[in-house]
Amino acid sequence: MSPSTYSITFACYNAVHYTKLCVDSFIKHGTPLDRLIVVDNGSTDETRDYLQTLPLGGCIFNKQNLGCGVAWNQGALVQQAEWSIIMNNDVLVSPQWVESLIDTAKQNNLKIISPALIEGPQDYDFDEFTQVASHKMKNTLRMGNPHAVCLAVHESVWMDIGYFQAMPKLWGYEDTMFFHAARKAGIPMATTGSSWLHHFGSITQSEMKRERGLQDKQGLGGRHNYRYLNQSWLARKLQKREKVRNLKSWRTQELAQYGMTMHGVRKNGDFKWL
C-alpha cells in the first residue's frame, strides 16, 4: 500500500510521555512519520520541543486548547488523503495496523473503520498478543460500531456529512455527533479484529479534568450536549438499548468462537473481555 493513500493525525495536550510512546511505536512498526500530522492544543510541558525534533508530515501549534473537533479537522485537511486516520496519542500501534485497517475496509465496502482495542496498563507483551489476535480475529467485524480512539475515514465521508463539529466547548462530544451523522446518512462502518491498538486510556481528557478540578467520573462536556443530536428522549433510549444488546451479542459470539473479544481491558494482570 502506498503511504500516500492515508494520512494520520492526532491532537495532543501535555502528557508528552504518552506522545513519545505512541511515536516510538510508529517507528518500531514502520509507520512513516511523514504521514503523521500532529496538532498541539496549547501544551505547556515539553510536548512542543519534542514535536519539533520529529520529521513529521506536519505540525500545528494552537495558541490554546481548541478541543478535539477543531484539531482533528486541522490535521485531516493538511494532506487530504483518500483515508484520514484520526486517533488518540495515548496508544501503541501494532505491525501492519494501517494496512490491515484499510484493506479490511476496502474488502467490506466500509467507509469508517476502527481497530480492536486493549485498554489499561501495558503489563503484557502487546506485540506477541497482536500476532495471535489479529490472525485469529481477522475476519471479525462489529458492524455499525466504530470508536473514537482510532478511526479511518474515507474521503467520501467528508463530502457526505462534513467534518467534525468545530466547537471547543464540546470537550469530547465531537465523536458522538460525528457517528450520529454517519448513521443517519447510512454510511457503512465497523470495528475490525484484523488490526489492534493498545490504549492507555483517555490521557488528554484526564489531564484536562485535573486542571479543572473534576473527578475522573465527571464529564468534560456540558450535561445537555445531547441536545445537539436533535433526538427525542425515546429515540435516545431506544438507541442506547440497541447498543447494549449488540455489545452483549458480540461479546457472547466472540467469546464462544475465539475465547476473547475485540475489546479487552487489563485488570489485575489479566484480560477482562467486553
Q: Language-model segments: which ranges?
A:
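Short, flexible, basic/aromatic active-site loop/helix in glycosyltransferases
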Residues: 124-148
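N-proximal low-complexity "stem/linker" segments adjacent to membrane-targeting elements
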Residues: 1-25
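A short, conserved alpha-helix in the catalytic core of glycosyltransferases
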Residues: 150-153, 157-162, 168-195, 201
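Short, acidic, metal-binding catalytic loop of nucleotide-sugar glycosyltransferases
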Residues: 24-33
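Conserved donor NDP-sugar-binding/catalytic core segment of glycosyltransferases
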Residues: 95-127
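Glycine-rich, basic loop-to-helix element that forms the pyrophosphate-binding segment
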Residues: 62-79
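Short aromatic/hydrophobic "clamp" motif used to bind/position activated sugar donors
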Residues: 84
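A conserved acidic beta->alpha catalytic loop
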Residues: 40-49
